């Protein structure tokens, strides 16, 4: 039987919300739990949380859009903003824990991509794919 892709559910989150990350975690966990084992849900939620934290910190966008879609045995998450992507310095403000988010996201999922907008068409899209084992 061929694998099928289920259209995703998208939710917009105001970037100034004090509960944004908790709201995103609940949204992603609810959308992925029927398809993935709990450890995989946890990994995916961690990666999405990092993507959203990066969007809040670096994009200047008023909102962040998160989509949860099912692609065969996999859950695909996209995190989109309307800001301008800025590459950070290797270590920001002397914080050795800073600037590891992209590596963390890639380590937590089966496939990871980042599409940067341009000056003419702003916006960054992070795509995260986690598949059932």
Residue ranges, per PLM feature:
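Two-component transmitter module helix at the DHp-CA junction of histidine kinases
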Residues: 2-5, 29, 60
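A conserved short beta-strand within the histidine kinase catalytic ATPase domain
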Residues: 62-69
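Short helix-loop "hinge" at the ATP-lid/N-box region of the Bergerat-fold HATPase_c
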Residues: 55-59
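Short, highly conserved beta-strand within the GHKL-type HATPase_c fold
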Residues: 67, 74-78, 127
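Glycine-rich/acidic phosphate-handling loop/turn and adjacent ATP-lid/helix
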Residues: 76-102
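Flexible, glycine-/charge-rich segments associated with ATP-binding catalytic modules
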Residues: 1-17, 107-133
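Short strand-connecting beta-turns/loops that link adjacent beta-strands
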Residues: 71-74, 119-120
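Conserved short strand/loop->alpha-helix "switch" segment adjacent to the catalytic nucleotide/phosphoryl-transfer site
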Residues: 22-49
